[in-house]
């Protein structure tokens, strides 16, 4: 019995009331309730009921009707079979999944509806076709196994052929940050509650329990992976980790309807080797969003899709492994010599996405044009290897050795595939002449048919004496002899009528019929032969799978590093140094995005943070003075250093930083009912609870959104906490009272940004100077913003009155409530606080009361 979950409530559950075709549809749909079913009918994929309504809305196609259900029309929508790919791509990019249901039976022999089966399931993270993918971004499937308030997470970049296991996560916030950093196209989980809440705002589905069975997981690991890899995985990881890995393999098997043999590697991401940045900080620092001002858009100028995706992985997981960073820096320096990277980048620009092409070969979705692109790309490898060998360093040689020069495969593809093949093998015309003798002979029968028909037509004209006689062909009736009806008396007896038209008759002869059978038979045989050759060719190509994947990974690596070398020269970047002295010394630091987008010269600044001198900078100065830019550029520089890039500074000596936290800007989170201040406090609490002496913390204007005294009190308390933790902290504020902290804490210093006034105008110097700011210049900034003159004059008068009043009351009111020195507690209060009323005896209480009375007297 089918539920009403997947079709209109108006439809009766008893499908026997439907036509045989709709009955067939509903039976198939019952197995794919949560995804759209593309049901093949002739030259169209049709959708029915709620699927039709959803597709019509998503694709902007016409919603029609077919037949009745319970007295109401059945909604129907469809897309042409030959154009389906474009429509499917739209659906997948919106985060939905599709089941493709094809006609698998023979219409000529079928009794009732032609047999149909789902031949393929397409989900957002398991597509491999170029039309469905972003060339510059990995297509990622995440699996989350929740157990005992812990989250086990694994993910796969589907076309990369690898599964990555992440450390066990112990909080929802930690899980959310990890998932959003990966930016997956699809999430699967065993937790229905997590799927229902969906804190990630990504396509997510809760799977049946068996997907997360440890027994099933081990079975799929053994079935899917190479024996040695499987044994290693089973011995290396714990049961819950294996369950998570197995859930991905079982899900892929179900989607592919085959074992995912293209998965060849499982690896564990070591957190201690990673610079951690939560999702809010990534957004605040504009690291890798899609805007033109993002750091990625400025740094990322790779020549291949392979390199662009690898660079995004670097952005997702900056490494703290100094050996890896030293290797990258060494290669950047080598490629930068005499701008050798230019020659390499020129070759790289001719290399296609061979990683995804070979994955499509493995998955059975490859197209003939992909094979041509693979051949053309592999032809560039000898040139690339020669260029790399000219830089004979151990680091470059190591990469070069992993680029395989596949001459035999290039020769095979060159001989087999024509230069501009059709989109699919379906209609043939892919295999080059001369590659297969039998195919050539079958094709020659069709190719030589024109000569036969010319001779046959001339012979029939002579035989009948009818000069207007024509020999032709159409796809419905085949070959024919056409004569006008006025020549009916001259028709030879061996002519058999095939078709009657208004002014003519069409005939067939035994000789022409035999020729037709031979030609059509040869065409069918040629197509079958060509498909066999093509399948055999793909089996040969797949033998090179591991070599091509390794080559692709090496090309991606050299592309990223050549890009870094080019960016280093173009953007005047320098190689950073790393120290173990808990010191961060940066000279002439620049903000790349701002520098890129302004016409005037960018003013660089120095930054020094050290455990021995200062870990906390209190930064004051006017709005628009440069405080936020100063802080952001330091964080971006650290980030660039840990992805292996050179950095925008004349000098950079960097200590070990394990996490970057930022609290920059805020807005109301209306959907969650949280105010600006609540958002700010939540983010601040997260930083305070997690920051360590190895953290870099950026705090911009904390304490806004509440009263002045509340804001000042909170800002002071937070600053003191960061000073106590010893985290490297850049703390921008308009509360000038906080500058007094430098007198209390030896690791706190003041930095301010100056501005100059001239004839009622303000000029920002954008230069960081030691010491506290003396003025905020708020009214001058308001003038720059376009506030009218009458309002400005009123503001000046208000400011004068407030400052005058402040001078009179400052020593008694503000200092009494918010003095920076800790208030000395009243001795009487100290005695009262020391009493434990739960443990003292009545006699002791009387004695204490007597002593207190004496104190008061």
Swiss-Prot record:
Gene3D superfamilies for the chain: 1.10.1420.10, DNA repair protein MutS, domain I, MutS, connector domain, P-loop containing nucleotide triphosphate hydrolases
GO MF annotation terms: ATP binding; ATP-dependent DNA damage sensor activity; damaged DNA binding; mismatched DNA binding
Presence of the UniProt keyword Metal-binding in the record: no
Keyword terms of this UniProt record: ATP-binding, DNA damage, DNA repair, DNA-binding, Nucleotide-binding
Keyword flag Membrane: no
Gene Ontology cellular component terms for the protein in this record: cytosol
Binding site for ATP: 621-628
Annotated family: Belongs to the DNA mismatch repair MutS family.
The protein's name: DNA mismatch repair protein MutS
């Amino acid at each position: 019995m089918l539920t009403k979950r997947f079709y209109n409530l108006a439809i009766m559950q008893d499908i026997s009331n439907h036509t045989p075709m709709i009955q067939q549809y509903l039976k198939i749909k019952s197995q794919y309730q949560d995804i759209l079913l593309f049901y093949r009918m002739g030259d169209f994929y049709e959708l029915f009921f709620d699927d039709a309504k959803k597709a019509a809305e998503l694709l902007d196609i016409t919603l029609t009707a077919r037949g009745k259900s319970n007295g109401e029309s059945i909604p129907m929508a469809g897309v042409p079979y030959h154009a389906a790919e474009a429509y499917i791509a739209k659906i997948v990019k919106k985060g939905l999944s599709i089941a493709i249901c094809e006609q698998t039976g023979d219409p000529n022999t079928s009794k009732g509806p032609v047999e149909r089966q789902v031949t393929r399931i397409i989900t957002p993270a398991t597509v491999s076709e170029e039309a469905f993918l972003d060339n510059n971004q990995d297509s990622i499937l995440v699996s989350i196994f929740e157990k005992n308030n812990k989250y086990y997470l694994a993910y796969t970049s589907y076309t990369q052929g690898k599964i990555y296991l992440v450390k066990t996560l112990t909080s929802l916030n930690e899980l959310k940050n990890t998932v959003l950093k990966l930016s997956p196209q699809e999430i699967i989980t065993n937790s229905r509650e997590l799927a229902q809440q969906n804190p990630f705002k990504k396509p997510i589905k809760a799977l049946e329990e068996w997907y997360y069975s440890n027994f099933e997981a081990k079975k799929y690991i053994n079935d899917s992976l190479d024996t040695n890899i499987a044994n290693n995985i089973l011995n290396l990881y714990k049961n819950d980790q294996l369950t998570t890995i197995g859930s991905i393999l079982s899900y892929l098997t179900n989607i592919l309807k085959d074992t995912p043999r293209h998965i060849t590697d499982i690896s564990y991401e070591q957190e201690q080797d990673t610079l951690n940045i939560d999702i809010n900080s990534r957004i605040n620092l504009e690291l890798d969003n899609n805007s033109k001002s993002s750091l990625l858009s400025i740094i990322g100028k790779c020549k291949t899709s392979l390199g662009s995706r690898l660079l995004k992985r670097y952005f997702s997981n900056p490494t703290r492994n100094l050996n890896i960073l030293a290797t990258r820096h060494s290669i950047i320096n080598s490629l930068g010599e005499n701008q050798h990277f230019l020659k390499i980048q020129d070759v790289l620009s001719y290399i296609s996405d061979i990683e995804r092409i070979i994955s499509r070969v493995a998955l059975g979705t490859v197209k003939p044009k992909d094979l041509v692109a693979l051949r053309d790309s592999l032809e560039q490898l000898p040139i690339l290897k020669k260029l790399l060998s000219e830089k004979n360093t151990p680091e470059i040689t190591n990469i070069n050795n992993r680029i395989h020069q596949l001459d035999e495969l290039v020769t095979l593809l060159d001989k087999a595939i024509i230069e501009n093949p059709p989109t699919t093998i379906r209609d043939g015309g892919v295999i080059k002449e001369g590659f297969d003798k039998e195919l050539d002979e079958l094709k020659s029968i069709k190719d030589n048919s024109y000569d036969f028909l010319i001779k046959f037509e001339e012979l029939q004209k002579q035989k009948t004496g009818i000069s207007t006689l024509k020999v032709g062909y159409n796809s419905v009736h085949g070959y024919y002899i056409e004569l006008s009806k006025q020549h009916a008396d001259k028709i030879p007896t061996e002519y058999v009528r095939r078709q009657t038209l208004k002014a003519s008759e069409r005939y067939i002869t035994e000789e022409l019929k035999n020729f037709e059978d031979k030609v059509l038979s040869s065409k069918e045989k040629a197509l079958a032969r060509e498909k066999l050759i093509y399948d055999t060719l793909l089996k040969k190509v797949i033998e090179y799978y591991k070599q091509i994947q390794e080559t692709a990974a090496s090309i991606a690596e050299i592309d990223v590093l050549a890009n870094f070398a080019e960016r280093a020269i173009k953007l005047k970047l320098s190689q950073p140094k790393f120290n173990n002295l808990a010191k961060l010394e940066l000279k002439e630091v620049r903000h790349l995005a701002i520098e890129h987008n302004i016409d005037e010269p960018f003013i660089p600044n120095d930054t020094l943070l050290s455990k021995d001198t200062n870990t906390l900078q209190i930064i004051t100065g006017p709005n628009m003075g440069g405080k936020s830019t100063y802080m952001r550029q330091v964080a971006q520089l650290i980030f660039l250093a840990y992805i292996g890039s050179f950095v925008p500074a004349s000098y950079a000596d960097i200590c070990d930083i394990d996490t970057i936290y930022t609290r920059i800007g805020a807005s109301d989170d209306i959907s969650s009912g949280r105010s600006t201040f609540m958002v700010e406090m939540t983010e601040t609490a997260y930083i305070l609870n997690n920051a360590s002496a190895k953290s870099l913390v950026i705090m911009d204007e904390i304490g806004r959104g509440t009263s002045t005294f509340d804001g000042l009190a909170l800002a002071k308390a937070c600053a003191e906490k960061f000073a106590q933790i010893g985290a490297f902290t850049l703390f921008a504020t308009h509360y000038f009272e906080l500058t007094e902290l430098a007198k209390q804490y030896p690791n706190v210093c003041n930095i301010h940004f100056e501005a100059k006034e001239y004839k009622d105008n303000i000029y920002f110097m954008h230069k960081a100077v030691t010491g506290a700011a003396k003025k905020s210049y708020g009214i001058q900034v308001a003038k720059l913003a376009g506030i009218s003159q009458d309002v400005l004059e009123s503001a000046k008068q208000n400011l004068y009155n407030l400052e005058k009043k402040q001078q009179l009351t400052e020593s008694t009111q503000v200092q009494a409530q918010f003095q920076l020195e800790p208030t000395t507690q009243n001795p009487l209060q100290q005695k009262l606080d020391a009493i434990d009323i739960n443990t003292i005896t009545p006699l002791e209480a009387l004695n204490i009361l007597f002593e207190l009375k004496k104190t008061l007297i």
